[in-house]
């Protein structure tokens, strides 16, 4: 039974399944399947058993199928079954198959009617089946029993939808003929996921159990309640047949005899029964497989491309080749050197867009981090001026000097140059760490050989640390060279003359009033900016207030905020001095004041301007900045150290001018030194560390690897890598084979066009007003009789009224006479006691009227309520 094309097609699909099941990827490859959907006791399991030709599925009342059963039928000379959870075990007794299904179901769901979405995978080999893959799903129910949860209806629905929503799943909607087809939950679920009806095939079971005098002819002919793929009727064995040991072969013969002998079905007997259902499914499966092949091929090609680059390295792997390890070692070291160079020097191909490479990070160290460390090394202005003052006084000793001593300048400059050692050595440490990180990233390619990876990393890291020491020695030497000779004749150095002139300009204040904006740019250089609180003015106005202050060489201005758009006032620095103010008892601020030596008002009606900071360090810093602008402390408020310590700021104008001169000289010379150091340190690191490490890797690494350990030990492959290589090669071959199989399928098969769409709106409107279903009984429920052709039979049979019990024989009654039908012959030879159908037009004379309504007597029983109402 079955067609030869399908017998050639499905083994190819099964080969696809087998190829990927071995790799654990069958779940990722959505191969076409057929899902059997229906209500409880609809005959789903019986349909499956007819395919297999054996009794092997559990039977009983209520919910029997409690887990999805994935059934793969394979044509074979021998007859046996295999479970995925019992690999290698063949079941030749199908009673054992039934017991194993029940036992496996109970292992997961328990023994009290519980359900689970975990499928049972069963493959049946038999000469009596076609090659098909089907899924038996739990029957649709609404009332929970046993251990079933209250939402059993929704759980089963979700489980069914999990399978039938896949676009590559054909839906076998099973509905008993003795129930209302219009309310079939199976067809409604299929309609939800397959609105076009391209994947849905209707199956009508229990045709032999319909009430006498009724049939499902109009449904099977797809005239009433149509589906795009139509319906196939089947007759399954009854429980009595099973108890009587009626085998499948006898059941098939009985099914064939039923359709040939039944007057309503014998003209379509060749399109009914399990054999025809198998052929229909095979053809639909063929079409579906061919339709899904393009997407399937794209998926396989995508997987193949994703691993092809990696597999390329494994293709030429020959474990038996004695020179393999030597070649591999040379290739690995060469690749490591290339990777290291690319990460340091940069590369135009395969640019990493996720993180900075080692070379880019070193560039940031050279041009961002190192200059920042130098700038961060700020001079304490107050401390620096004190040191300059001490140096001048100590050089003069007991004498009173007339000139600014250059030895004080050299002493201060040398001390500041030595401070550059810290940032310079720190930059060496940062570059060394980045080189080691780069080596670790490059050795990831050597991870397949653990010992080689470990030795390479160790040897190169040791060399980097060795070069680190030599680089630091050279950096310290550069600093010492700068300390050894102070070149005051440098072209960029301002010299003593310019420094003294600049210092004298600080003391010569021009009386320009409040016109600082007209000064030349050199006089408008900002010395300091920051927030200060004006305390004495704010007290009279209800509280102190903060302003943004800007100090230049000529004025002190304050603004509303740091955007410097709204200027409040600009105070000239002429004749101003600074003094300390005692902190108030309740105040947390530190205050200093500016006042005019000529007893003039500083700001409006105020003789002094009291400014507050959050800390004493801020006060000292502002006072030092004011000193640079020429605002000196008041003598009367200068505190002397009684323990022999010198005063913080000398009030000797000559000394202050000398301090300012040396301060300017120190600034000028240190800018020259900083520029030189910022240029030389990166060059030194580049030459002694980075370039040296690159040369070492290219020229000496291989020799040191050979001398450090035996070659065979170095090139021992990790177990994980060997397994991974074998797995990748197997995957690669399986993907290539799968693509070849797809090509074979396209060659040996032909698609058949889908049938035209039909009006299946009855599925959408059945909730509101279900139409009469001929699969239960034909009912004459119209308010007025439809016009019929004339008939010679006389009045139509009566509509029987329902008896007191649903199973009691009906009592017929006759309505008024109907118009006669045009023909009187009965082409179906119905028995005399059952009125037969009216004859239809011969095939050669097409009828212009719709098919006449049936005239056989029908039995009226109460309508079954829809499961979806």
UniProtKB/Swiss-Prot annotation:
Modified sites of kind N6-acetyllysine: 299, 604
Residue numbers spanned by region G1 motif: 38-45
Any one Gene Ontology cellular component term annotated for this protein: basal tubulobulbar complex
Domain Dynamin-type G: 28-294
Keyword Mitochondrion: no
PH domain: residues covered: 525-631
Residue ranges of the region described as G3 motif: 136-139
Domain GED: 659-750
Phosphotyrosine: modified positions: 231, 603
Keyword line: Acetylation, Cytoplasm, Cytoplasmic vesicle, Cytoskeleton, Endocytosis, Golgi apparatus, GTP-binding, Hydrolase, Microtubule, Motor protein, Nucleotide-binding, Phosphoprotein
Chief location category: cytoplasm
Tissues expressing this chain: Isoform-specific expression in germ-cell-depleted testis (Sertoli cells), brain (peripheral sensory neurons), lung and heart.
Subcellular location: Cytoplasm; Cytoplasm, Cytoskeleton
Biased composition (Low complexity): 775-796
Any one Gene Ontology BP term: synaptic vesicle budding from presynaptic endocytic zone membrane
Region G5 motif: start-end pairs: 235-238
Region (G4 motif): 205-208
Region (G2 motif): 64-66
Single GO MF annotation: nitric-oxide synthase binding
Residue segments, region Disordered: 752-869
Keyword Nucleotide-binding: yes
Matching InterPro entries: Dynamin, Dynamin_GTPase, Dynamin_GTPase_CS, Dynamin_N, Dynamin_stalk, G_DYNAMIN_dom, GED, GED_dom
UniProt similarity note: Belongs to the TRAFAC class dynamin-like GTPase superfamily. Dynamin/Fzo/YdjA family.
Function text: Microtubule-associated force-producing protein involved in producing microtubule bundles and able to bind and hydrolyze GTP. Most probably involved in vesicular trafficking processes, in particular endocytosis.
Name of this chain's protein: Dynamin-3
Organism: Rattus norvegicus
This protein's encoding gene: Dnm3
């Amino acid at each position: 039974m079955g067609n030869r094309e399908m017998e050639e097609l499905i083994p190819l699909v099964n080969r696809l399944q087998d190829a990927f099941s071995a790799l654990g990827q069958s779940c990722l490859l959505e191969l076409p399947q057929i899902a059997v959907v229906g209500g409880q006791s609809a005959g789903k399991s019986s349909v499956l058993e007819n395919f297999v030709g054996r009794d092997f599925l559990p039977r009983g009342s209520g919910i029997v199928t409690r887990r999805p059963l994935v059934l793969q039928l394979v044509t074979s000379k021998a007859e046996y079954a295999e479970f995925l959870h019992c690999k290698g075990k063949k079941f030749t007794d199908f009673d054992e198959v039934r017991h194993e299904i029940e036992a496996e179901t109970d292992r997961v769901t328990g023994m009290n009617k519980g359900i689970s979405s975990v499928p049972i995978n069963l493959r049946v080999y038999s000469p009596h089946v076609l090659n098909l893959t089907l899924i038996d799903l739990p029957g649709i129910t609404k009332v929970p029993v046993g251990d079933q949860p209250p939402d059993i209806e929704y759980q089963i629905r979700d489980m069914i939808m999990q399978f039938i929503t896949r676009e590559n799943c054909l839906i076998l909607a099973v509905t008993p003929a003795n129930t209302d087809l219009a309310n079939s939950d199976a067809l409604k679920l299929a309609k939800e996921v397959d609105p076009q009806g391209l994947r849905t095939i209707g199956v009508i079971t229990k045709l032999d159990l319909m009430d006498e005098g009724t049939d499902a002819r109009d449904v099977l002919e797809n005239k009433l309640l149509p589906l795009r793929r139509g319906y196939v009727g089947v007759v399954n064995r009854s429980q009595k047949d099973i108890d009587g040991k009626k085998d499948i072969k006898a059941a098939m013969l009985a099914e064939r005899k039923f359709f040939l002998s039944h007057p309503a079905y014998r003209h379509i007997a060749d399109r009914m029964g399990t054999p025809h259902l198998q052929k229909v499914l095979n053809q639909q499966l063929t079409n579906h497989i061919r339709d899904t092949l393009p997407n399937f091929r794209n998926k396989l090609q995508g997987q193949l491309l994703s691993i092809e680059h990696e597999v390329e390295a494994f293709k030429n792997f020959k474990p038996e080749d004695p020179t393999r390890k030597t070649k591999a070692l040379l290739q690995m070291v060469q690749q490591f050197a290339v990777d290291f160079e690319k990460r340091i020097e940069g590369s135009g191909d395969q640019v990493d867009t996720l993180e900075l490479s080692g070379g880019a990070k070193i560039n940031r160290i050279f041009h961002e981090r190192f200059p920042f460390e130098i700038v961060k090394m700020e001079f304490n202005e107050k401390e620096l001026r004190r040191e300059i003052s001490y140096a001048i006084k100590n050089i003069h000793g007991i004498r009173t000097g007339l000139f600014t001593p250059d030895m004080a300048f050299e002493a201060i400059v040398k001390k500041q140059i030595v401070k550059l050692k810290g940032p310079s050595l720190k930059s060496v440490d940062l570059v060394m760490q980045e080189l080691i990180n780069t080596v670790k990233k490059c050795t990831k390619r050597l991870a397949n050989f653990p010992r080689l990876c470990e030795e390479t990393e160790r040897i190169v890291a040791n060399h980097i640390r060795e070069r680190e020491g030599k680089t630091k020695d050279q950096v310290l030497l550069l600093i010492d060279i700068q300390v050894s000779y102070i070149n005051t004749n440098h072209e960029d150095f301002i010299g003593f003359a310019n420094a003294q002139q600049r210092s004298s300009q600080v003391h010569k204040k021009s009386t320009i009033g409040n016109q600082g904006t007209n000064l030349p740019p050199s006089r408008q250089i900002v010395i300091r900016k920051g927030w200060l609180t004006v305390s004495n003015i704010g007290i009279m106005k209800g509280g102190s207030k903060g302003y943004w202050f800007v100090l230049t060489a000529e004025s002190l201005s304050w603004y509303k905020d740091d955007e410097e758009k709204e200027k409040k006032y600009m105070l000239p620095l002429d004749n101003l001095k600074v003094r300390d103010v005692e902190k108030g008892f309740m105040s947390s601020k530190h205050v200093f004041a500016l006042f005019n030596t000529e007893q003039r008002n500083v700001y409006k009606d105020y003789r002094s301007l009291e400014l507050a900071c959050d800390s004493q360090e801020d006060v000292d810093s502002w006072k030092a900045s004011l000193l640079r602008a020429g605002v000196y402390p008041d003598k009367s408020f200068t505190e002397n150290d009684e323990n022999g310590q010198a005063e913080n700021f000398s009030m000797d104008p000559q000394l202050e001018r000398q301090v300012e001169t040396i301060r300017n000289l120190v600034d000028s010379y240190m800018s020259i030194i900083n520029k030189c150091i910022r240029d030389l340190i990166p060059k030194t690191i580049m030459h002694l560390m980075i370039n040296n490490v690159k040369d070492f890797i290219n020229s000496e690494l291989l020799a040191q690897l050979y001398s450090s350990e035996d070659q065979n030990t170095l090139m021992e492959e990790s177990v994980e890598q060997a397994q991974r290589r074998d797995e990748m090669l197997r995957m690669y071959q399986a993907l290539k084979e799968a693509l070849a199989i797809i090509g074979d399928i396209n060659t040996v098969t032909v698609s058949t066009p889908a049938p035209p769409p039909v009006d299946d709106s009855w599925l959408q409107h059945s909730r509101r007003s279900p139409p009469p279903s001929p699969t239960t009984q034909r009912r004459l429920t119209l308010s007025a009789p439809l016009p019929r052709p004339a008939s010679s039979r006389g009045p139509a049979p009566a509509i029987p009224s329902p008896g007191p019990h649903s199973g009691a024989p009906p009592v017929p009654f006759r309505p008024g006479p109907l118009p006669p039908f045009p023909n009187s012959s009965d082409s179906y030879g119905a028995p005399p006691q059952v009125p037969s159908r009216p004859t239809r037009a011969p095939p050669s004379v097409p009828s212009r009227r719709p098919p006449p309504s049936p005239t056989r007597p029908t039995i009226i029983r109460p309508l079954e309520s829809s499961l979806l109402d």
